[in-house]
Amino acid sequence: EERPYGRTTNLQTLFRPPGGRFVGEMDLHWDADRLAFTMPDETGWHVYELTLDAQGHPAAPARRLTPQVEDADHFDPCYTSDGGLVFASTANMTAVPCWHGKQKACSLYRIGPDGSVRQLCFDQDLDLHPSVLADGQVVYSRWDYSGTMHMYLRPLMAMNPDGTGQRAIFGSNAYWPNAAYFPRQVPGEPGRVAAVVCGYHGVNRMGELVVLDVDGSGKVPAGLLHRFPGRSVSSLDDVRDNLVDNSWPKFLHPQPLSSRYVLVSAQVAGNAPWGIYLADMFGNLVPVWVEADRDCFEPIPLRRTPRPPAPTDRVQPHRTDALV
């Protein structure tokens, strides 16, 4: 098949959802033999898994991993290094205050290696975009709807896969950025993650592509290492609600290859399609796959990667008291 910009490649469909259903929010296992993703069925939104063979071809039909819970949706999965899976769910039955309960909120849950399901987060509002850091902890975005300045309270959090040790690692007690979404560990560089920063209202979870230091104090501006493409760290005095509405290009779904190169979904202008690009810190935004009549999202290199260590599970479900 002819690829844009004069090169050729072989495209392969790994999975075609029945009935044209949505399929996305993908996470590839470190062994590259399993792909978890979100897809709806007749009962709601669920997490599914596709098994892959050594050549990256589907080895079996996709199977559903999450249980059916009345009036609840499950989505946004990530594998954990201890053999479990973390995902978001509306089974907590909470809602966003400013919508007077009409819009559901979600918390993070865990499927253990034994198949058991347990709630990890008990926040008032949304916990989103879990992924795994180099030390095996889970990083995610949390929205704290509290106080008069809640439009600036969406820090990056980290916790152990069992839900213990929850703490803010970037953006706490700061006015910039309003939010950081889609955090992903930079390979081979512990303490650094790629993410998309954006405002509170305005465009939805799309914005500027950055690399952050989450091993230090988590403070701004010291924690901001780079903004792409090719933009060095500059003044962060632009504190406002609709932070990135007029910022181009806009980014989604970063997959860092290093702190200098990030495979990412990008829209270069308001009338342009979303495509797959390679962004680098030298100012380049190289198109990898762009089609005029459709949008392309969520690039993931289909390859094996080193598995992080598995933190010790410290939860004791049989206890009837709390241990602090």
Regions found by a protein language model. Name each.
Residues 141, 182-278:
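Loop/turn-rich, solvent-exposed surfaces of beta-rich toroidal or solenoidal domains
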Residues 34-38, 49, 85-90, 138-143, ...:
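Residue position within the beta-strands of beta-propeller blades
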Residues 1-9, 97, 105:
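Blade/loop signatures of beta-propeller domains
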Residues 68-169, 173:
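Solenoidal tandem-repeat scaffolds enriched in leucines and small polar residues
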